[in-house]
Amino acid sequence: GASSVGKVVKYTVFLPVILLVIMAIKGCTMSGAGEGLRMFFIPSTSAFEDPSLWIDAIGQVFYSLSIMMAIMFAYGSYLGESANVAKDCVIIALSDAAVIILSVIVMFSTMGGVGMLDSITDSGIATAFIVYPQAIVNLTDIGWFNALFGAIFYLMLVTLAIDSAFSIIEGVSASVADKFHFNPKKVTRWACVISAVISLLYATRAGVAWLDIVDNWTNQINLIVIGILECIAVGWCFQIDKVWQQINRNTKKFKMPRIWIRLAIRYIAPATLL
């Protein structure tokens, strides 16, 4: 339930941010960090002509904000009557963008500091478990410091994984428990067991290949298709004015214009995803 999740995520959400700040400070103080940061903040304009770049970016935003995922419906059901949806959405989006920028600063500054910017374009899996560990080894000549920095990095990954697991499992368990009136704890337990068994596939020799396939499917094709279908369902099949009323129900100064809601959900969002 919401109370159990809240007790854990308040640590798993803020701890990675603290660790990222520590890593960013270290990365930005390295001699070659400027080259990496320059590569990030002044990108090649030709890269924006690649359609796959935009698909990857949309998939990243969808996954990072959990847009179109079951967890949004589950967490939404936990909101009280006084919740300011419009304000919360703005805060969440800006916070997410800030953390993403901080993460990229850590990556580019560290990779620039150890002279490994040529490997920055590797896949996310390779970057996290092959390229970045190599960069950590070359941080300094002090072995224990490199080991400490590596421990901080992987502690951050573990806390992020736990936080993601909570969101994924809660979205499934809350929906099933509410729909069929099952015991929420039992549903959560079975969801964890089934997910753990399925995840054993990634521990096989073909695990990396399967992980790439699932990652590309869920973060790109699947989320985009579901996004278009949900825009059609909400914009054309559901009374969109009710959505507008719910968004602005508890707002005082910042109110979402009705015309913008209609245009965004019915036309702009589907066209952008296509």
Name each model feature, range by range.
Residues 6-167, 173-190, 194-198:
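Membrane-embedded translocation segments of transport machinery
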Residues 200-205, 271-273:
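Alpha-helical transmembrane segments and their membrane-interface junctions
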Residues 107, 121-131, 188-192, 203-204, ...:
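Flexible glycine/proline-rich, aromatic-decorated loop/lid segments
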Residues 1-15, 266-273:
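Hydrophobic transmembrane alpha-helices of multi-pass small-molecule transporters
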